[in-house]
Amino acid sequence: MEQVLSSPQGCSEWEVNGKTEWESDQNPLGFLLVDKENSSVADPTNEIFQENAINLDDLFWASQTYSWENGLDCVYPEWKAQPPPSQDLKGDGNSGISQLVEGDLICFNSRSASPSLADRPVQDNNLYDHAEQVEVTATSSTLNVCTGELGINAPTLHTDKTLLQDTHLMLEESHLTNCEFSCNSGVENESQNFLSHGTRNILESEGLFAVSPVEVSCVDTNSNPKPTIVCQTPPLASEHIYLSSSALPCEPVFPMTCTKPHVPPYHAGSATLPMDEVEMMLPKLQGGEGESSKPSANNRTLEPQRLDANTDTTHLSVCPLGESDISPEHCEEMLHELSTKCTVEMVEEEVNKKSVSSNTTNTAFSKPKTELCEELSGCTLGVLLETVSGDVKEEAASDSRTDHVFPETQTDLAPVALIDSQAEDPSTESLPRKNGQEESKSALPVSTPEHNALFELSSGNVVLPEDHSQSTFSAQTQALSEVDHDGDLTPDGMLTDNIVCEAVTSIDSVILSLTDSFELPKLSDCDLSSHDFESHALTLEIQNNVTCVQTGSVDNNPEEMSTPFTCTDNQLTVTGGLAGLDLTETTSQSGEASGEGEAGLPVLPTHQEDFHQLTPSEINLAQEQQVSSVVPSSPPSHRDVFPCGASLDGEAYLTLMENNPDTLKHAEMTLDLCKASDALPTKSLQIAPVDLIHVPIVSATAPRSEEQSALRAVFQALDQDGDGFVHIEEFIEFAKAYGAEQVKDLTRFLDPSGLGVISFEDFHRGISAISNEESAYSECETFTDEDTTALVHPELHEDVETDSGIENTLTDGDDRNSPSSFPASFQNFLQSEALEFFCTHCHKQISRLEDLSTRLQLLEMNRHLQQSNNLDVMGDLTQDILDLADRDITDKVLLLEKRVCELEKDSLESEEQHARLRQENLTLVHRANALEEQLKEQELRTEEDLLAQTRKHRDALNKLQRERDLEIENLQARLHQLDEENSELRSCVPCLRANIERLEEEKRKLQDEADDITQRLNEESESRRKMSDKLSHERHTNQKEKECTQGLIEDLRKQLEHLQLFKLETEARRGRSSSNGLQEYNTHMRENELEQEIRRLKQDNRSLKEQNDELNGQIINLSIQGAKSLFTESLSESLAAEINNVSRAELMEAIHKQEEINFRLQDYIDRIIVAIMESNPSILEVK
């Protein structure tokens, strides 16, 4: 994660994307999270901080825990004395591995991208246009570094008249006598350096003097015919680059084991640098105070007494010195010769590439394996450099892995500097390796303040021979490399797939910078075992032997290549020339600091000192970043490590400020880091706030393709439906969710046509427009009191911090997503008071800037005077330097005037805003008073209503009480009445029981009678049934007889009719009259028919009567059965039980009902008997 969600004050977050700028209150894009893997991150702030940022609260806790638990005397690891190095040359790179030395190894993980400030874009401020984009890495430990298998190119070295004007490699103090480069007896005589295309190395030594790189240029003649690379760091022609100082004696050094790199074949077209130029560039500052008299490191050992005496420091070890055989006149002649050869060749394709800073660009050197021995034979001095051959568009950084690991601290081979000069197409990714070639990355920075040292670097051979290199244990240097910034510790001695460096020493040995007024007398008589000196004394010795580390970077992975952090055991260190010395301490303060020790050196504060009472001293931005980036889980011996980064001189910084007005945005982080430093314990190297005028902020401009890829990742994250457009509503919700305040302005930039959707082109164009617009935001918020704290008197420091605290109160609330514990009115009051105090301090900036302008002029004059006194070899350039300084001072004054005008405008705006806020506050006060009056009136009305309701409630309660009493009285009277009735009913119970017994006796008698009658009835019914059966049988028999008789009668009638007819016929034949006979016959026939009809009707009547009788009998049977069921025993028992259980009234009612039923039954029986008597009396007869 290269960009982290940043708060407005930026106290606890880093922002290290190659193009973005430090976010503030004015930046509405602070909520966007751009991931290097082209993915948008929308995680919560806590998760983001855990993975990609530094938690200042944990840092503050971790930085104090060890000191508080262990007291003032913190124990740090001791380094055991090691035997003198062997003088045997090893033929192979790994032949010396068997000679192990007891010590600690720190394993570094360089695969992850750590947050850094080294990749910020600034405009190119050097004398050339559009220098190559490069990667800045730093190390403070002596590392013997061997490059991987890189392509070889032979560049042409050039320089300019401004070779030393832009670098100002000057030793300000007269006690820093010379810079001698020692020679090794085993060094071969031929060595050459080659400047590669597309890479760079900045020499820098943490805790030592920052060497401003010398500007040179080289032409790539082999790998890419495109451009000539303009570089500002000349090849250092020294195996042991040593800035001698009489302050401290030298300590013994020890050999380091390095691996021998595999070198590809040498290109025939490569050009070499003449050996005489190497010798001509060897400087010798002053012959009166040479360090050649110091004993050789091969004949000395570490003093165990010092190791035992004080555990807070580790003894300083330096490389053996050698006499320089190059005279100052010869060096001066060489400088003139080089100045006439300077050329500037740039290709149009490289125009879009930006230089990282105005004083630092890349230098690289390459050497083929086949030509190595021949060139080493002529080499007397060399410096080990390792370069990164990667995509310059990806800022030339590679995620490296260790393929060959050196054993702890012993070596038998001298480092060999092989630098790849292959230029890569900026539009492509890093080139893959071929034939097992490996790409290695490391750096050996050597930095010296331009105000304090002159360091001439040779343009000749820079390749080291394969010989014993001397490693040192230094209390003032730290081995830095790339490591995971998430806080994971790698155990000592454990080998990973990354760079392995020797362990670092205690933090108490961090070196402070010198002020322009410090005097550095010789300290040969100082007590090095004293606590103040050993823990806090400034050491001015520089050594650059390095441990050979060969790393391999991952192919085709530019996302993992830009890691500008270097670290030792979780000690994050910003590299790449981001920070330099802050020489803004006043003369009186310098004098006070000089008087604290015998050697006139500044002494760091102890636990008992209050940070707010300290005299502001020099500080660089890298140290503050180190304070804010130390992982809390790191061991106490590796906490609070501050690197000294490469610094910009005054002229370069002024040019930087003119060409890049956005630099103050980067300076805002310095303010926040100063605030964070207040929370650290004094034992953990308390530091004074930084003077932004002298804080160099250098960054690299990200390539356009990387910017587009990062923006596309954000756009794809916002484009949820994947249609290539982002709706305005979704973007507004996303912006509000991450605290963006100027959402309307964002939508105005991103959707100028008002279509409601945002395409990627509009998104990219809008973000660019917003970035350009933000470059001119008010400096009243960035250039706060902490910007010029170094100019403020110590007693005013507390007020300045109070102002900063008020600013934090104004801005920290919502951005940290923490609910406020104060009321809104109190917060508004704090904001108004803080704004008034803040604007008051804005006016103070004007006077301070004027003092600052005068001070800058004095500093420049003093620096050039020091240069003229210490640089006899540069006599012919002194006038040019002074003229350049005058022009630069004039430019600075103009810049300061411009800033004063801007501050005045901002002050006027602040006054207007303050007046408006006062008016609003007055309106709010009136409104609050009116509301208070309304509240009082409402309270009075409420009290009156409450009293009225209380009275009503009391009256209602009294009424209810009276009603309850009356109801109780009524109920008592009713109860008394019921008791009387109950007593009466109880007295009636015996009588009723006697009546019940009498009635039961009568009931039993009736029951018996009914039983007798029923029995008789049953008998009669049985006899009747028998008789009915017999009757029906007889009737059936009679019917058959009747039918037979009827048939017989019919036959007889027929016969009679035949006879009558026959008679009539016979009479007719006899002559009688037939009419009378015929009439008689007809009459007789009619009578017969009528008789038959009468008989039939009678028979039918008889059958109907029989049916009627049967039905009557059935009715009588049913009636008898019903009456019998009424008088059964079960019914009588249930009736008695019911009589016992019911009341008197119910009993009387039941008796009346029963009597009615009996009456009805009696009437019904009587009617049945009457009907029987009328219809068939024979049924009732007793037989």
UniProtKB/Swiss-Prot annotation:
<dbReference type="GO" id="GO:0042803">
    <property type="term" value="F:protein homodimerization activity"/>
</dbReference>
<dbReference type="InterPro" id="IPR051977">
    <property type="entry name" value="Rab11-interacting_regulator"/>
</dbReference>
<keyword id="KW-0175">Coiled coil</keyword>
<dbReference type="GO" id="GO:0051301">
    <property type="term" value="P:cell division"/>
</dbReference>
<dbReference type="InterPro" id="IPR011992">
    <property type="entry name" value="EF-hand-dom_pair"/>
</dbReference>
<dbReference type="GO" id="GO:2001135">
    <property type="term" value="P:regulation of endocytic recycling"/>
</dbReference>
<dbReference type="GO" id="GO:0005813">
    <property type="term" value="C:centrosome"/>
</dbReference>
<dbReference type="GO" id="GO:0060090">
    <property type="term" value="F:molecular adaptor activity"/>
</dbReference>
<dbReference type="GO" id="GO:0000139">
    <property type="term" value="C:Golgi membrane"/>
</dbReference>
<feature type="domain" description="EF-hand 2">
    <location>
        <begin position="738"/>
        <end position="773"/>
    </location>
</feature>
<keyword id="KW-0206">Cytoskeleton</keyword>
<dbReference type="GO" id="GO:0031267">
    <property type="term" value="F:small GTPase binding"/>
</dbReference>
<feature type="region of interest" description="Disordered">
    <location>
        <begin position="1005"/>
        <end position="1044"/>
    </location>
</feature>
<dbReference type="GO" id="GO:0005509">
    <property type="term" value="F:calcium ion binding"/>
</dbReference>
<feature type="compositionally biased region" description="Basic and acidic residues">
    <location>
        <begin position="431"/>
        <end position="441"/>
    </location>
</feature>
<feature type="region of interest" description="Disordered">
    <location>
        <begin position="423"/>
        <end position="448"/>
    </location>
</feature>
<feature type="binding site">
    <location>
        <position position="730"/>
    </location>
    <ligand>
        <name>Ca(2+) 1</name>
    </ligand>
</feature>
<feature type="coiled-coil region">
    <location>
        <begin position="902"/>
        <end position="1121"/>
    </location>
</feature>
<feature type="binding site">
    <location>
        <position position="762"/>
    </location>
    <ligand>
        <name>Ca(2+) 2</name>
    </ligand>
</feature>
<dbReference type="GO" id="GO:0061512">
    <property type="term" value="P:protein localization to cilium"/>
</dbReference>
<keyword id="KW-0963">Cytoplasm</keyword>
<dbReference type="GO" id="GO:0032456">
    <property type="term" value="P:endocytic recycling"/>
</dbReference>
<feature type="domain" description="EF-hand 1">
    <location>
        <begin position="706"/>
        <end position="741"/>
    </location>
</feature>
<dbReference type="GO" id="GO:0032154">
    <property type="term" value="C:cleavage furrow"/>
</dbReference>
<dbReference type="GO" id="GO:1902017">
    <property type="term" value="P:regulation of cilium assembly"/>
</dbReference>
<comment type="function">
    <text>Downstream effector molecule for Rab11 GTPase which acts as a regulator of endocytic trafficking, cytokinesis and intracellular ciliogenesis by participating in membrane delivery.</text>
</comment>
<feature type="binding site">
    <location>
        <position position="719"/>
    </location>
    <ligand>
        <name>Ca(2+) 1</name>
    </ligand>
</feature>
<keyword id="KW-0472">Membrane</keyword>
<dbReference type="InterPro" id="IPR037245">
    <property type="entry name" value="FIP-RBD_C_sf"/>
</dbReference>
<keyword id="KW-0813">Transport</keyword>
<keyword id="KW-0967">Endosome</keyword>
<dbReference type="InterPro" id="IPR019018">
    <property type="entry name" value="Rab-bd_FIP-RBD"/>
</dbReference>
<dbReference type="GO" id="GO:0032588">
    <property type="term" value="C:trans-Golgi network membrane"/>
</dbReference>
<keyword id="KW-0479">Metal-binding</keyword>
<feature type="region of interest" description="ARF-binding domain (ABD)">
    <location>
        <begin position="911"/>
        <end position="1015"/>
    </location>
</feature>
<dbReference type="Pfam" id="PF09457">
    <property type="entry name" value="RBD-FIP"/>
</dbReference>
<dbReference type="GO" id="GO:0055038">
    <property type="term" value="C:recycling endosome membrane"/>
</dbReference>
<dbReference type="GO" id="GO:0030496">
    <property type="term" value="C:midbody"/>
</dbReference>
<dbReference type="GO" id="GO:0005768">
    <property type="term" value="C:endosome"/>
</dbReference>
<dbReference type="GO" id="GO:0030139">
    <property type="term" value="C:endocytic vesicle"/>
</dbReference>
<dbReference type="GO" id="GO:0055037">
    <property type="term" value="C:recycling endosome"/>
</dbReference>
<keyword id="KW-0333">Golgi apparatus</keyword>
